[in-house]
């Protein structure tokens, strides 16, 4: 890892979607069968529910957890770029997905289909057709997408809180943002105005930054509500959490230590015992 990326764990990028939903074990089976995901970590609570898990899909990481206490379910929308959208759509359906729409050629140059997984997350499965690459420039395999009422204000929040750069924005004649993309660090985040069946949908994202405390303060100053103030975590990062005005969760972190899976589990057990 280069010097500039020390605040990001190996294999991760600035932004990682964090799916909080029921049936994470079932979800991991789905993404493995449908998208060729590779499990990289899984840790269960005493009651058997999954406290944290992660998978790799080609060049992207995704994290998952089952709801617990104040952390409620937040099924998400994810844009997935792969070389053959039709084949991946068929695999997703065979793995237990429900069709949102069959693959079709879109006006923006993608061939795309939509599938809802058994845990309630929506996957927009696409192959880009305009550049000779299966993903548009700057995109990776996995891109999180926020659907909100008030996308223009959301873009302003992302700029103030996280230093986001707007790289694409399409508005309708009334000035409503239909779709936009911003760059945060090395990662793209998509945003759109909720409408029709595509209603508001809060989601969670893990955001790695050089100074978690400073970015947390910037998020609060930009209008977010604190969920947890930054502190050193047993799993090797300093992190805090904030919720924006649209209900999206931001887990703002700076990587501090690279730990083995065994060490994470040992520290987790100690943390659980200390918490009582």
Please describe what each predicted stretch is.
Residues 6-9, 53-54, 68-70, 105, ...:
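Short secondary-structure boundary/capping segments
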Residues 8-11, 18-62, 145-188:
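Core segments of cupin and vicinal oxygen chelate
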Residues 15, 50, 110-112, 142, ...:
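Short loop/turn microsegments at loop-to-beta-strand junctions
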Residues 23-25, 56-57, 61, 78-119, ...:
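Vicinal oxygen chelate
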Residues 43, 67, 104-105, 194, ...:
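Short loop/turn motifs that cap or connect beta-strands within the blades
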Residues 63-65, 114, 124, 190-192, ...:
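Conserved beta-strand in the GNAT
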């Amino acid at each position: 890892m280069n010097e500039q990326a020390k605040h990001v764990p190996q294999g991760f990028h600035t932004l990682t979607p964090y799916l909080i939903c029921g049936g994470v074990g079932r979800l991991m089976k789905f993404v493995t069968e449908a998208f060729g995901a590779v499990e990289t970590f899984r840790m269960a609570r005493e009651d058997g529910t999954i406290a944290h898990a992660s998978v790799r899909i080609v060049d992207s990481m995704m994290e998952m957890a089952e709801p617990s206490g104040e952390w409620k379910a937040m099924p998400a929308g994810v844009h997935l770029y792969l070389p053959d959208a039709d084949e991946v759509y068929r695999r997703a359906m065979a793995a237990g997905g429900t069709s949102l729409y069959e693959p079709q050629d879109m006006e923006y140059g993608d061939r795309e289909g939509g599938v809802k997984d058994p845990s309630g997350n929506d996957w927009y499965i696409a192959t880009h057709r305009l550049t000779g690459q299966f993903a548009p420039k700057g995109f990776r395999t996995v891109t999180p997408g926020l659907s909100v009422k008030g996308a223009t204000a959301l873009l302003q929040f992302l700029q103030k809180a996280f230093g986001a750069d707007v790289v694409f924005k399409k508005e309708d004649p009334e000035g409503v943002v239909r779709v936009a993309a911003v760059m945060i660090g090395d990662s793209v985040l998509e945003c759109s105005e909720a409408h029709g069946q595509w209603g508001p949908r809060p989601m969670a994202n893990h955001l790695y930054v050089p100074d978690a405390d400073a970015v947390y303060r910037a998020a609060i100053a930009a209008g977010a509500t604190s969920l947890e103030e930054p502190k050193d975590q047993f799993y090797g990062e300093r992190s805090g959490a904030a919720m924006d005005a649209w209900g999206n969760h931001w887990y703002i972190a700076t990587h501090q230590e690279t730990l083995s899976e065994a060490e994470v589990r040992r520290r987790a057990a100690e943390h659980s015992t200390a918490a009582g």
